[in-house]
Regions:
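Alpha-helical residues within the helix-turn-helix
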Residues: 46, 57, 63-64
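Hydrophobic alpha-helical membrane-insertion segments
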Residues: 32-36, 67, 92
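N-terminal helix-turn-helix DNA-binding core of bacterial DNA-binding proteins
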Residues: 10-54, 76-85
Length: 116
């Protein structure tokens, strides 16, 4: 923290990089599948409907950002979650979305006439 209690720019940059890695729905889908246990690229491709090359690209980013780990077993590489904390963040976002939708509904109901 800076003297004024603000986050330093270097830390903000690192945080932004992690958020960018999570800003892709396919990556969130992959992480969600990995909650159930480790998977290979082929497993993830079958479960997501994405091509293996595309899954590998997403896994590389998730690995570089520390969201997944990997282990080699024979010819296969198995990926698993490195940090379940990402789902706490997802839960916070979902709660905020519910609140925003509720407020929008209340605003619309406040301006619409009663049913005829």
């Amino acid at each position: 923290m800076t003297p004024g209690g603000r986050l330093p720019p270097e830390l903000l940059e690192l945080i932004a990089e992690r958020f960018k890695a999570l800003a892709e729905p396919a990556r969130l889908q992959i992480l969600d599948i990995l909650r159930e246990g480790e998977r290979t690229v082929a497993d993830l491709a079958a479960q997501t409907g994405l091509g293996p090359a595309n899954v590998s690209k997403h896994l590389r980013m998730l690995y570089l950002m520390g969201f997944v780990t990997r282990r080699k077993a024979g010819p296969n590489i198995y990926y698993r979650l490195a940090d379940e904390g990402v789902f706490q963040l997802c839960a916070i976002v979902c709660e905020r979305l519910r609140d925003a939708i509720r407020r929008q509904q209340e605003a619309v109901e406040g301006i619409l006439p009663p049913q005829i």
